[in-house]
């Protein structure tokens, strides 16, 4: 099911009101219980990327980051992983073209999506096995930003994820972090990556949860 081209163009419009209105329509569009293809979401993220690109004021950047991450639970569950997977694919593809003045807002956007993933895991684990939901997300991350065979994926994104991972995890589980394979994507990359910089730097930047005080389901 393809997103209409005019709709995507409105998301990347120069006029902020046009972009905001398109974003409201997007919520209804994504909530449909209809299957999307990978290309559909890649086209959509192209528009959303430039929507973020043109956000020039800090408060609006924060609001937009929150609004985009808030799309995750709105997306029909059968499309949810693909929606996030294509987000990370878009970040990896566009990263080298982001100038230094825009880097921080995209770091913020990635932080919000990391948090949205953890919240979705928490919500879904109320009706499904936690390990199963975490495994589904881990597969998405290891096929995407943590794919060790993708030598072109920017180190900066992985370093940022290492910096924020546990912080965002603890926000979702402020008291007890349930036992699960939360760090499997990092462990896999550290173990198998041919990138020496990643193997040496990721362990130093990753602040792991030292103890689990709550068993998984």
Swiss-Prot record:
The keyword DNA damage does not apply. One of its GO terms (biological process) is rRNA processing. Its main location: nucleus. GO terms for cellular component: nucleolus; nucleus; preribosome; preribosome, small subunit precursor. Keywords: Nucleus, rRNA processing. It comes from the Eukaryota. It holds the Pfam family Nop52. Transmembrane segments: none annotated. InterPro entries: RRP1. It is found in: Nucleus, Nucleolus. The keyword rRNA processing applies. Required for 27S rRNA processing to 25S and 5.8S. Belongs to the RRP1 family. This is Ribosomal RNA-processing protein 1 homolog. It comes from Schizosaccharomyces pombe (strain 972 / ATCC 24843) (Fission yeast).
